[in-house]
């Protein structure tokens, strides 16, 4: 979802601070690029923010990107900091992880489900 105002453009993305906390926690920079390069249109400056509704829920600020709503983005160099520092904040499922090796893409961890989150829960005896 893109939200453009007179002073700032926002790309509200599926990724959030619960997936990659480093930008919110200590302003870590991770390159964020569109998976498919657009031939049409021009790059605009965006803040890439998540849906968690916290002022610190961002993955990138002031990024020049040629994107439209629905585009798939790659967060580069997240590496071991992704899952190891992720959480279920706001009951969000942990993200899937992919590894890119040259031109091969491998799913190395499936996206978590609500059932995964609740697996260890127990109901008190009534």
Describe each model-derived feature in a short phrase:
Residues 1-126:
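Charged (often Lys/Glu-rich) extended helix/loop segments that serve as interaction or gating elements
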